[in-house]
Amino acid sequence: LCNLFCTLRKKEMKKFIKYLIQLYTKIQNKLPSHPISHLPLSKVDIQPIIMIPGSSATENRFNKMVQKLNHGQHPHHSLIRIKVWNDSRMTYRGHLKLKDRNPIFVVGFQNNRDGYKNIKKQAAMFNAAMTVLREKYSFTSFKGLGHSNGGLVYTVFLQQYLANHSGLEMEKLLTIGSPYNLNKKEVSDRVPMLEDFVTNQDKLPQQLQHLSILGIFFRDGDGIVHRSSVEAGSLIYKGKIASHREVVITGKAAHHSSLPQNEQVVDLIREFLLG
């Protein structure tokens, strides 16, 4: 009887803690945003993890994933969510712990539409955000994560903008369900974006380590992106950087929109970017 009572109490406590986390997140999302110039200072040298969400998603896209990443981690990683507006303004929400060496910055865009033309615009907006972050924190190295089209934005940034940031090195990039050949099902049917990525592959940083996560939810893809489109990333990265690896995630939680919160994916993120 005691064991049953204790088990029930534990379940109730877990539900209550989950409720508190959800409530805290809702409150955080409703807090007013601040101009990017008001970003708090750090008391330590940082190597941030900078994340880019996919099309139609906002800077809040990774809230649940970061909660899972922080579970059991001491201390927790700070989460700063930055939004780049079409008029070049930048605002942020979140709190930076003064001694957090690996804070998480998420950069979202007002223009979060799909299509190669918009992806190039988003890469320019991301570059502007990187300039502001470097001016504020003077970091020389960072790691990145891109979900879906966020991985494409990162690819454009690496090939077109990174070299302009003197003394900056990108150590690792983790992409999740990134469609390097957009909606095509055959690698032989290359879209102009993939052609550009392959043409400019020599501009990729040679020291970069890349982990590409592919979801198999239904037949040959994650329900949104075809397997071959994600695998086309090897045409861009393999042999041009320090390492390129692909990991396949299967099952009910391998749908395109579920992948960032997938427990296996969270473990891979923790191992690859936080390890």
For each of these PLM feature ranges, what is it?
Residues 19-145, 152-275:
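Lipid deacylating catalytic domains
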Residues 10-11:
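Polybasic, lysine-rich low-complexity intrinsically disordered segments
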